């Protein structure tokens, strides 16, 4: 069972997935810092509040923390944009597969088609 697990985990796809998850986690930390430490203060300068995550409004007993939601939206948009550009780059670098044309029909296929056509004409 241990041997099977080693074979499973060392296959190419699993290793690619593991590397992707690790890099994704590190990238998320970078994007979070970018949004929190650079983008939010810039937006805060325009709206008069430096810390967007504390933006909220209250209706009765309910408090709506829309600042945290704005942070999450900004994080998502940045990550989506970077993933979009990475996919475009990979598609540009990866060689395109050529579409295989159907091979020419063999003599046998030609004869069978002729027989089929003759039988169809005869049965009309």
Curated annotation (Swiss-Prot):
The chain crosses the membrane at residues 15-35, 67-87. The keyword Cytoplasm does not apply. Signal peptide: none annotated. Keywords: Cell membrane, Ion channel, Ion transport, Membrane, Transmembrane, Transmembrane helix, Transport. It holds the Pfam family MscL. Its main location: membrane. It is a multi-pass membrane protein. InterPro entries: Mechanosensitive_channel_CS, MS_channel, MSC/AndL, MscL_channel. It is found in: Cell membrane. Homopentamer. This is Large-conductance mechanosensitive channel. It comes from Lactobacillus johnsonii (strain CNCM I-12250 / La1 / NCC 533). The lineage of its organism: Bacteria, Bacillati, Bacillota, Bacilli, Lactobacillales. The gene is mscL.
């Amino acid at each position: 069972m241990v041997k099977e697990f080693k074979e499973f985990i060392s296959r190419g796809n699993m290793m690619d997935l593991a590397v992707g998850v690790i890099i994704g986690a590190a990238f998320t930390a970078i994007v979070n810092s970018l949004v929190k430490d650079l983008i939010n203060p810039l937006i805060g300068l325009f709206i008069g509040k430096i810390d967007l995550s504390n933006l909220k409004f209250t209706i009765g007993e309910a408090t709506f923390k829309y600042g945290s939601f704005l942070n999450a939206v900004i994080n998502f948009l940045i990550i989506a944009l970077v993933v979009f550009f990475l996919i475009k780059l990979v598609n540009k670098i990866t060689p395109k597969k050529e579409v295989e044309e159907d091979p020419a029909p063999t003599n046998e296929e030609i004869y069978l088609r002729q027989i089929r056509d003759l039988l169809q004409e005869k049965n009309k």
